[in-house]
Swiss-Prot record:
EC numbers on record: 2.7.8.26
Stated family: Belongs to the CobS family.
Spans through the membrane: 4-24, 34-54, 58-78, 108-128, 136-156, 197-217, 254-274
Membrane topology term: Multi-pass membrane protein
Localization (cell): Cell membrane
Sorted UniProt keywords: Cell membrane, Cobalamin biosynthesis, Magnesium, Membrane, Transferase, Transmembrane, Transmembrane helix
Protein name according to UniProt: Adenosylcobinamide-GDP ribazoletransferase
Cofactor: Mg(2+)
Length: 280
């Protein structure tokens, strides 16, 4: 199989629950061509967006928000959310850097992890509902399209957030008994400046398709959220691992949706100047 096709296919095996099959050879190719992260995000975003569009025609807002969340985790899995809970345990641990790293890598779930997981899920739900509520006034009968485009942009932004935090991060030191790199370290090593730039440009272009330049606002905000998370990971752990990269995915998605909702509100109040919403 062509190396690019293998990397693209492996992206779905690595970033989603779609049963395409995945091998170590495929993972190696994906890490060499990690710019496929936002490409895979675009495909997943289309699927999620279609569900959001159809659901907006049928279900009440709160029900649809819950259904969208369910479909997102059905198609992407809970691995990234597991990273959120691990990061929460590490953030809440007291003591030295070593103790924090130990809590981060501990397989048991603590209070900090539970709290962080709940907060992220609540924020995800709230961000979807905010887009719905603010979008009614701005888009009216075109609200289903807004939901489609918002979920599409959010998923592309989530995957680019993973690429962003990996591109600017450095891996945590390996454990003494670990002789091979983990998936987090492999991701960081693969996120070269060239791969980051290719992925970033692709993501920026596709996020502009539904809304014009306004589509860049949530995309850039998600990337910035990844850098903020990286700063906190350095402060608490002295580096970055796969849990931090997975957390960037969840935070990036939520950040994009929140910024879309805020942008809608500001545009309705006339605070966006010459920027106008455009429909694909």
């Amino acid at each position: 199989m062509n190396s690019y096709l293998l990397a693209f296919k492996s992206g779905f095996g690595f970033l989603s629950t779609i049963p395409v099959g995945i091998t170590m050879e495929g993972i190696d190719e994906l890490m060499k061509k990690i710019f496929f992260y936002p490409v895979v995000g675009a495909v997943l975003g289309l699927l999620i967006g279609i569900v959001a569009y159809a659901g907006q025609l049928v279900f009440p807002g709160p029900v649809l928000a819950a259904l969208i969340m369910g479909f997102v985790y059905y198609i992407t899995g809970f691995n990234h959310l597991d990273g959120v809970t691990d990061m929460g345990d590490g953030f809440m641990a007291h003591g030295s850097l070593e103790k924090k790293v130990k809590a981060l890598k501990d397989t048991t779930l603590g209070t900090g992890g539970v709290a962080f997981g709940i907060l992220v899920l609540l924020a995800f739900y709230g961000s979807i509902r905010s887009v719905q509520e603010e979008g009614i006034a701005a888009f009216g009968s075109n609200l289903p399209f807004l939901m489609f485009a918002s979920m599409f942009i959010a998923e592309v932004s989530a995957k680019q957030s993973m690429l962003t935090i990996a591109a600017f991060g450095k891996p945590l030191p390996r454990l003494k008994e670990q002789t091979y790199p983990g998936l987090g370290e492999m991701t960081i090593n693969g996120a070269t400046r060239k791969n980051f730039l290719i992925g970033f440009i692709f993501g920026a272009v596709v996020c502009c398709l539904p809304f014009g330049l306004i589509g860049l606002i949530p995309y850039l905000a998600a990337c910035i959220s990844a850098l903020v998370l990286l700063n906190r990971s350095y402060a608490h752990f002295g580096g970055l691992n796969g849990d931090g990269i997975g957390t960037a995915n969840e935070i990036g998605r939520i950040t994009a949706l929140i910024v879309i909702a805020v942008t809608l509100k500001l545009s309705l109040n006339g605070y966006l100047g010459g920027l106008e919403w455009t429909l694909l």
